[in-house]
Amino acid sequence: MRLGFLSVLFGDRPLKDVLKLIKPLGLQAIELGCGNYPPDVHCKVNELLESKPKRDELKAMIKGEGMIISALSCHGNCLHPDEAFAKKNQQVQTNTVLLAEQLGVKVVCDFSGCPGADDESTKPNWVTCAWPPDYLEILEWQWEKKVIPYWTNQAKFAKDHGVNIA
C-alpha cells in the first residue's frame, strides 16, 4: 500500500514545489485535482488532453520525485438540478476520465452528486430521513429518475476507457 495526498491542499504553490515539500515525508502517491469543487491548479485537464508533451512532462515530474499518480479528482455535482451547473460538472468528469486513460491512471474520484426533490427543483435536496412518507417519495424519485440512470451510463463510459470511478 502507498501513502499519498490530494494536491489541492497545496493549491497556492506550484506542483514542482509541492512535490519537493512532500517527498521528505515519505508519501509515494498524489491525487491531482482536476476541477469542479477541487481546483485544477496542478492539472489543467483540457490543456493536458490536447498536448502529449505536457502529459509526458507531468508524468516525468511526478515520477522524478519517486511518486505515482494514484487518482485524478473531479468531485462535483453532476446531478445538480441547475442544468448549466450539472453540464459543466459532467464535462469536467468526462474529460477527467479521458485524461486518466491517457495518463494510465486507473481511478477518478468524484462525488455521487445530489439531485433536487423533483424536476422543478433549483437546489439539491439531500434526503436524510424516512418519515414522513414524502421524503421516501423524493428519495425514490431521485434514485430512479436521476442517480441510477446517470451512473449506469457513467460507469459504462469509465469502464470503456479503463477507469474506475471512486
Task: Enumerate the predicted regions with their spans.
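Conserved beta-strand positions in the central sheet of alpha/beta enzyme cores
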Residues: 31, 71-73, 109, 166
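Structural motif corresponding to alpha-helix initiation and N-cap regions
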Residues: 12-16, 51-56, 83, 94
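Catalytic domains of carbohydrate-active enzymes, especially glycoside hydrolases
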Residues: 16-38, 100-107
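Radical SAM/AdoMet-radical enzyme domain recognition
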Residues: 28, 59-64, 68
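Glycine-rich, proline-tolerant flexible connector loops at the mouths of alpha/beta enzymes
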Residues: 33-59, 112-119
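Active-site acidic/histidine proton-transfer and metal-coordination neighborhood
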Residues: 17, 61-64, 78-166
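Active-site beta-loop-alpha junctions enriched in small/polar residues
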Residues: 6-10, 33-37, 74-77, 113-115, ...
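Extreme N-terminal starter segment of soluble prokaryotic enzymes
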Residues: 1-4
